[in-house]
Amino acid sequence: MKGQETRGFQSEVKQLLHLMIHSLYSNKEIFLRELISNASDAADKLRFRALSNPDLYEGDGELRVRVSFDKDKRTLTISDNGVGMTRDEVIDHLGTIAKSGTKSFLESLGSDQAKDSQLIGQFGVGFYSAFIVADKVTVRTRAAGEKPENGVFWESAGEGEYTVADITKEDRGTEITLHLREGEDEFLDDWRVRSIISKYSDHIALPVEIEKREEKDGETVISWEKINKAQALWTRNKSEITDEEYKEFYKHIAHDFNEPLTWSHNRVEGKQEYTSLLYIPSQAPWDMWNRDHKHGLKLYVQRVFIMDDAEQFMPNYLRFVRGLIDSSDLPLNVSREILQDSTVTRNLRNALTKRVLQMLEKLAKDDAEKYQTFWQQFGLVLKEGPAEDFANQEAIAKLLRFASTHTDSSAQTVSLEDYVSRMKEGQEKIYYITADSYAAAKSSPHLELLRKKGIEVLLLSDRIDEWMMNYLTEFDGKPFQSVSKVDESLEKLADEVDESAKEAEKALTPFIDRVKALLGERVKDVRLTHRLTDTPAIVSTDADEMSTQMAKLFAAAGQKVPEVKYIFELNPDHVLVKRAADTEDEAKFSEWVELLLDQALLAERGTLEDPNLFIRRMNQLLVS
C-alpha cells in the first residue's frame, strides 16, 4: 500500500472509545444501527451532490447498503455505494471528533454507567460504536468522482493510533469490516443479524441487503436479499406505522438512544404541500446551550435530502425539536441563503411552530407527568419564547409552568390557567416575584400581606425570568404585577386598616421626616406601609424603575447598570420601627435607621455594599 502512515487519535477519541466500550456494552447491538445509519447518510449526500453533477453516480444510481459476514475469519462487513471519503476526510472523520464542546462533554462523564450510556447515546457515537464488539476495524473507501487509485485504507484496534494508506478501489463508497472480539459470535449468525437490521432499519429509505450463499452444481452462488421495507417512513400512511417504528426512526435521525416524549406526523396539501415529522426529545441534548452548534430540522425537497440542521424552519426557543420537513414547494437547488429570504420558508416556519405548540399543549393536557418531564428538560428554553415570538405569545404562555405560594414547593408545576382559575373575587392582576433562588422568593417579605389574604403569588427564580416578564405583560386579559414594585392594587390591599390605625400613623409623620432627612438622596422616598406583618421594613421600586433582578442581569452581562433608587417602606406596627421612632439620640437613631435599611436591602438584593458595617451596627445594638 502506498502512502502508509500511522497516526495518533485525538485525545477526545481515545477517551470516548474507552467510555463507550464499557458503558454501552449492555446494548451492544446498536453498532449495526449506527453503521447502517451512517451508510444511509452517505447515500443521501451522494443524491444531493448528484443533483448538480449526475456523473458522480458513475453509472450506478441504485444506492444500497450491504451486510455480509465470514464465520471462518470472524468478520462482519457493512458496505455502501454512497458518497465515500477522500484521504483527508477519512483522517478528519475517523481520527478526530470535530464537535465543539466535546472536551467538556467528556469530562462530565463519570462512573455512573447508566447515566454515561444515555449521555454518550445523545452525543452520537456513530462509527466508533464498531469497537464495542470489534477488536480491530478496517475501512476501505473511495469518494464519488475520484479515480480508483485514489481509494483510502484505514485500520485501528481502537486504542491509541490508526493506520491510513492509499489503495486502489474500483467501486465508489465505503466498506467497513469488523474483526469481532471473542465471545461476539452472535453477530455471525444469519438470523440474529437479520433481526437486528429489521428492528433498526425498516424506516430507512435505502435498501439494506444481506448476503445469501447457496450451493449450485458444486459452486457457491452469492446473491443479495433485501430485508427492510426501504420506504422513507414519513412518506407512509400514519395508520400503517407503529409506535415502535416512529421511535426507532427518531433514534436514527436524532442519534439519541432515548425514546422521544411525543411526536407529530402530518401531510399538508393545498396552497403549500409538505410533510413534517416532528419529535420532542425526552432529554436535553448535551450541547443545547452551545451557541456555536447548529440546531434544526432535516430538510428534504420532493423526498431528496438537502441538508441537516435547517434552522430556518423552527424559532430558536424551539431548538430542541428534532425531525424533518419534506417540501414540494422549494427548488432542489435550494441553499441556506435562499431559505433565509424565502416566503415559502416563512410560511412553513409559522405552520411548524404552531404545530409544535399544539403538540406541547396536547401533551400537557393528556399526560401531565410527561409534560413535567418536558418542562424540567426544556422549560428554560421555552421561556425565551415570549420575547422572540409575539404572534404566539398567548400559546407559549399557556405552556409555561411556575412555582407558587399555592403549592409551596420549588417544583414548577403551576400553569397560568391554574392561577387564573384560583384568583380571588375582585382580583384583577396576576402577582409574581423574581428572586435569585426559590428560597429567597418564598421567604420574601413582599409576600407577607398577600399570604395573609390568601392571594397566590408566582415564585420566579430562574435567571431568565425577569427578562421574560418584561415581554410577558398579560395573560387572559389580566396584567402581571411584580409584588416588589409599587402598585395601586397592592396599596388597596394594604389600606384596609381601621380609622384608629390611621390616626396613629399621623403621629409618625415627624419620624418619617427624620428618616428622609437622614437618608437624603440615597432613597427615592420613605413611607409607611401595611403590606408587612412580620418584617420591619422593605425596599421596593417604582413601576417605571429597573427592578433589582434586571439590574443583576445587566451586571452579569458586563453592562453598565443604572442606579436603582428604592422606596424605603416601614411597618408602623413593628416593634423595631417603634423603637427607632422613640429614639431621640441622633447617633442611635441613625444606627437604627441604617440597620433597618440594610436589612431591607439584604432581603431584596441578597448582598450589601459593606456587610462588615452592617455586622458592626448589629453587634452594637445587640449589646446596647
Curated annotation (Swiss-Prot):
PROSITE patterns: HSP90. SMART domains: HATPase_c. The keyword ATP-binding applies. It is found in: Cytoplasm. Belongs to the heat shock protein 90 family. Homodimer. Residues 337-552 are annotated as: B. Molecular chaperone. Has ATPase activity. This is Chaperone protein HtpG. Coiled coil: none annotated. InterPro entries: HATPase_C_sf, Heat_shock_protein_90_CS, HSP90_C, Hsp90_fam, Hsp90_N, Ribosomal_Su5_D2-typ_SF. Residues 1-336 are annotated as: A. Its main location: cytoplasm. Keywords: ATP-binding, Chaperone, Cytoplasm, Nucleotide-binding, Stress response. Residues 553-624 are annotated as: C. GO terms for molecular function: ATP binding; ATP hydrolysis activity; ATP-dependent protein folding chaperone; unfolded protein binding. GO terms for cellular component: cytoplasm. Pfam families: HATPase_c_3 (PF13589), HSP90 (PF00183). It comes from the Bacteria.
